Amino acid sequence: MNSKFKKSKFTVLNYSALAGYIAKRYNTLIRLIVFSRNNTLSATIKTTDEIEKMRVAGRLAADVLQMIGEYVKKGVTTNELDQICHDYIVNVQNCIPAPLNYGNPPFPKSICTSVNHVICHGIPADKQLKDGDSVNIDVTVIKDGYHGDTSKMFVVGEPSIMAGRLIRVTQESLYKGIRMVKPGVRLGDIGHAIQQYAESHNYSIVREYCGHGIGANFHEEPQVVHYGRPNTGETLVEGMCFTIEPMINAGKRYSKILPDQWTVVTKDRSLSAQWEHTLLVTANGVEILTLRDDEEIDRVINH
């Protein structure tokens, strides 16, 4: 589940590498202070114990998406999908669905279901899915106080050529970003790689919503935008955890929020797609904490 992007010009102190070393060596929580003109932000470096909890939460979130796939079919309502996921998260996994009652106004459901031209934060409802519908299911679970956040695109029946291509390119854009992750890389490098790939296929990147740091809190620093310029933004450090979750439109990039104050749609009603993973920056690259069995990318990527 992404966060609303808040613009801020900031610079990370060059002590970040030292902080990462201290966190790893002494299993101590370190906060990197990020200064902006108007406020102070912080990004947590996870300890060894926290990383293990993040791995557990990530696997559980991925498991929910693997479970729900067989239920995404013609005639089902997104409310029914929400109830199935809720029962599984609470009664089988003994977890907490993070979206439920989150935010202001409180989000009323346990998952987000974003259908066709809905970009993100779609609220499950009683409308039945029909053949050709594409739906993003966004799941976040809390286990032992730590969050795992991931989303996947599903299609009812066979996708149209347009929807199938958009879904594929969006997932490939996510993978392009993931493969960039390692200590020393800057967030602008990742955003640029995603933007360049999506726009090379004549798609647009949603800019109002972004990935985010994650851990004991649902949304932490840093903000991870899916566009940008190389060699800009925060520098990645071993032990950071964050999501990458590009939202890509078949039409123009502009969005609007519906009166429910949650559902975000494309202004031109063009199709939108999104995929999301929770990631850990390792000593040599990245670990995908929410990887599913149906994916063909490695869980651990070393550079």
What are these regions (language model features)?
Residues 2-303:
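Active-site neighborhoods and metal-handling regions in enzymes and metal-associated proteins
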